[in-house]
A protein has these predicted regions:
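Charged, terminal alpha-helix-loop-beta segments
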Residues: 1-211
Length: 211
């Protein structure tokens, strides 16, 4: 990759790794939490983060949970690189499927607020300074209602979506996700690449499945 400073002088951009940048999985997760539009492919798409590190019935933790502009619950699982995927006790995609199954039981926006969004707001209370006189439940309800109105959402959680994010994927994950897609499971893989340009770090995100 190059940056074109003038017509005849392209400057190469150095590809690096999150490990070389001393960035951990939680750092990537936090970057996406605060900038979730990085995973939206078009201007028409949008997501609202409603949960982080949410525990399911098996005591597992999902990285990020969102609602999209169609009212679907989106489970976002993050791994730093292929090594992190390989070192897991269970396949990357199976972990996300279990979390999606637990979110499928949410039948109303009030359940979403009570079980996920209000605890998330409480955890990140410092980010909601304009609503400091409201309870976490009141803030979550207001933010969710605003998002639903803005996106003209008429259905809630009719479908669940899974998004896997990593700087690289192993063949097992790629094959499994491709098969799940062919069997109508809404699951996507996004590859995230860090680049270094002088003292700046550039991030490039590419959807690799489905194409």
């Amino acid at each position: 990759m190059y940056i074109l400073e003038n017509k005849n002088q392209p400057t190469p951009i150095e590809e690096t790794t999150f490990a070389d940048l001393n960035m951990l999985e939680r750092d990537i997760e936090e970057m996406l939490r605060l900038n979730i539009d990085m995973l939206c492919e078009t201007d028409e798409e949008s997501m609202l983060i409603v949960g982080q590190q949410v525990r399911n019935e098996q005591n597992g933790r999902s990285d990020l949970t969102a609602i999209d502009n169609s009212g679907n619950i989106v489970l976002i699982e993050v791994k730093r690189d292929v090594n992190d995927i390989a070192n897991r006790k269970e396949p990357f995609e199976f972990q996300a499927i279990r979390y999606a199954a637990s979110c499928a039981t949410l039948k109303s926006t009030s359940e979403l607020v009570q079980n996920l969004f209000a605890p998330y707001v409480e955890k990140h209370r410092s980010e909601f300074t304009k609503e400091q006189n409201l309870t976490a439940t009141e803030i979550a309800t207001r933010k969710l209602d605003e998002f639903i109105k803005q996106c003209n959402i008429t259905e809630f959680n009719e479908h669940q979506k899974i998004v896997l994010v990593a700087s690289g994927f192993d063949e097992q994950t790629i094959s499994a996700v491709a098969w799940l897609n062919s069997n109508k499971v809404d699951i996507s893989c996004y590859q995230i690449f860090p680049y270094r340009l002088n003292d700046e770090i550039l991030i490039y995100i590419k959807k690799i499945i489905p194409i």
